[in-house]
Amino acid sequence: PLQQLNKLSDETPVLIDLKPTGDHYMEDLFKAGGLGVVLRELKPLLNLECLSVTGETLNERLQSEAAYVNREVVRSFDQPIQKMGGLVSLFGSLAPGGAILKRSAADPTLFESEGKAVVFKSLEDLANRIDDPDLEVEAHDILVLQNAGPMSDAAMPEAGYLPIPKKLAQSGVKDMIRISDARMSGTAYGTIVLHVTPEAAVGGPLSLVKNGDKIKISVKNRSIDLLVDEAELDN
């Protein structure tokens, strides 16, 4: 369950300095010592009695020291890049089944936010209107994409990385809260809430969001709520 994700993420530090949150690339991790280095640092959190494909336990596999470690790429356990993991799951009236935010790639100034929804009913609707100069949207609004989950006609494409509306991008806006039942590339950066469940296509609360509705997000409280009367959601 997603509640377990929060527990694991809160206990597991970010040790690898890779894009989009860092400066290096995957090949740099390989040259810095690879996953073996990372696993050795994470030993306090691992079940070391698990068997590997060689028949050895994980502990036995990690006994030997790495020949080389580049600490600019892989930090030590006691000197992490971030003390908590990159993912956090959010729950509330907008996502009773949960949603996921990659906090390590998000803007911390948006972690506690309340804003007005700007809704796109589908990928086609998004494509047709996102760059419209007459789109009613401001930097503190929250973009919402519906019907992009696994049960939708779109079948959950990597569409969660909603573009910043052209009129805002031209004024210098680099990030804003974006919410959908879609997914996105692991290399994407932004304050983007994904995998909202239940999804819009099966009648989840996401499908009920209208332009102008208020949405509140709190990473601290692990919450994401649609601020309308419960009776309206029930109907």
Predicted segments with their positions:
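Catalytic or ion-coupling anion/metal-binding cores of large enzyme and transporter domains
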Residues: 1-200, 204-235
